[in-house]
Amino acid sequence: MKTTSLKPADVDKKWVVIDAEGLVVGRLASIVAMRLRGKHKPAYTPHVDCGDHVIVINADKVKFTGRKYDQKVYYHHTGYPGGIKERSAKFILEGRFPERVVEKAVERMLPRGPLFRQILGHLRVYKGAAHPHEAQQPQALDVGSLNRKNVSA
């Protein structure tokens, strides 16, 4: 039996839309990261971008388990000495760009490198239910029905 190795020209990329309303952030992010890399396909090749385009809508309505909504802290550095800044998940989700919570969760589940930057370009996250990708005819993926723990009670 021969091992198949995909060429970039042979990859069939689909468009998938996921409604994040009521879903647990980490579980959603792991499924999205798997789809972006293409690990759900039988002909997965690690050095080829063989994943799908993923659209996440209602990113502002994701859930955290436990007390992470209040206690989880996101750090960034300004570049100046002593310039470490922190924000809570609650502050970000109630702020201007709540989709960044999902973007960061997915980004941190992907391996770094040139392929990482290419793969991350196939992720689109929107805070509302509307998205401008209807022309691509994305297929809906119900993440909540895959496992009962994916949905926060």
From Swiss-Prot:
The keyword Ribosomal protein applies. Residues 134-153 are annotated as: Disordered. Pfam families: Ribosomal_L13 (PF00572). GO terms for biological process: negative regulation of translation; translation. Coiled coil: none annotated. Keywords: Ribonucleoprotein, Ribosomal protein. InterPro entries: Ribosomal_uL13, Ribosomal_uL13_bac-type, Ribosomal_uL13_sf. It comes from the Bacteria. GO terms for molecular function: mRNA binding; structural constituent of ribosome. GO terms for cellular component: cytosolic large ribosomal subunit. Belongs to the universal ribosomal protein uL13 family. This protein is one of the early assembly proteins of the 50S ribosomal subunit, although it is not seen to bind rRNA by itself. It is important during the early stages of 50S assembly. Part of the 50S ribosomal subunit. This is Large ribosomal subunit protein uL13.
